[in-house]
């Protein structure tokens, strides 16, 4: 029986690429999403990957959503915590709501998804957790104090949880993408991309979602069983941590 992978924020962008790559690698894949129903259903039809809607900032919604996935596909062996939002503002203008929403999805959401799955992974003696953090969680970013704090928190969670899971056959790793050519990034004016963003990237281009996805496929595999508590920086040389 093939292993089951669950990807949060899996119906678009980097998450969609991760889902497609995991399916191509032979996994049974489920994609969580929270927003656009039409977009999610289109992804489901195009990819053949089932989609499930819930908000990862709610612990009970995660418990219920995971139960639906496991009833359909079987126990989840691989969890990719990819869901993330931004509520950018300079700190002196940031509201408690902007802070709380980003922390709730980008950091607490990782706990909410991982915690209900942890006991089952321990009992089965196998698990793969891959947390999609960000270059801005490594270096910080002006105007993104909330996002940078949440993504840095994901890295601390990764390192601590890796120590707890290692003896039970569970690995916990993180990937920190830089500028990736998602729909959101490519919507930035071409002048800004070419004059301000790409010159910061030593390889001279944006990354592709599929490049991040290939990192996930490796970390999910048996070949990566000796790698845990690690961070892969997929940023084209923009930042070395």
From Swiss-Prot:
GO MF term set: acetoacetyl-CoA reductase activity
Positions annotated to bind NADP(+): 12-14, 39, 82-86, 177-180
One cellular-component annotation, GO: cytoplasm
Gene3D superfamilies: NAD(P)-binding Rossmann-like Domain (3.40.50.720)
Top enzyme category: oxidoreductase
Alphabetized Pfam families for the sequence: adh_short_C2
Catalytic reaction list: a (3R)-3-hydroxyacyl-CoA + NADP(+) = a 3-oxoacyl-CoA + NADPH + H(+)
Domain of life: Bacteria
Active site, renumbered: 147 (proton acceptor)
Key words, A-Z: Cytoplasm, NADP, Oxidoreductase, PHB biosynthesis
InterPro entries: Acetoacetyl-CoA_reductase (IPR011283), NAD(P)-bd_dom_sf (IPR036291), Sc_DH/Rdtase_CS (IPR020904), SDR (IPR050259), SDR_fam (IPR002347)
GO biological process annotation, one example: monocarboxylic acid metabolic process
Compartments reported by the entry: Cytoplasm
The protein, known as: Acetoacetyl-CoA reductase
Gene designation: phaB
